Amino acid sequence: MARSRHPIRVAFGRVLTFAAVCLLSVLALAPAGASAGTPQAADWRVRLNQQLQLMGHRNWIAVVDSAYPLQTSPGIETIETNDDQLKVVQTVLNQIAKAKHVRPVIFTDAELKLVPESDAKGVTAYRQALTGILGKTAGKTEAQSLPHEEIISKLDEAGKTFHILVLKTTLTIPYTSVFIQLECGYWGADAEKRLREAMASH
């Protein structure tokens, strides 16, 4: 006479089978090559919007070319956008313009203006396009050029304490990275100076 299976064991077996099926379904739907902690290129706009809401005074956003180094300071987050650099710059500036709590201070590489077309094909057109984009923000933002290594050092130092978002692009022209330091959008340098002077007089 065949022995009947215990009802608890039968139920437990069914639960395990269901769990296994669910796990296989999740794995099948997961995008190929996805790994934990590595943002996918399609998500860079979402990540930018999420981070911008949290960012403030002394945070940075950098839009960099393909060969920009992966920095190791704990506060630096690098995302591969797999997108056009000028397009990413424009998107970042547009999003910052919509934010009331921050304003951009833009840094570009001082070397860029001296890179010859003969050594970097496309650099002339790039300079013109970037000037056009930054020209639209004239009067609304501060912009200055510094040597590339000096800017990287600024980011490396800031990344020890503050969050920095680096958006890596497909551009293959040197010294084209655009670095955006965020400042308080509702408190300017002149107001800060007056405040410090008032504090010093008391």
Segments the model singles out, each with a brief description of its role:
Residues 119-202:
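Glycine-rich, aromatic-bearing surface loops/beta-hairpins
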Residues 108-114, 119, 123:
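Long, position-biased, composition-driven segments near the start of the mature protein
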Residues 16-30:
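Bacterial N-terminal signal peptides
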Residues 35-86:
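Long, hydrophobic N-terminal alpha-helical segment
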Residues 59-62, 77, 103-107, 143, ...:
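Structural motif
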Residues 1-12:
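N-terminal secretory signal peptides that target proteins for export/translocation
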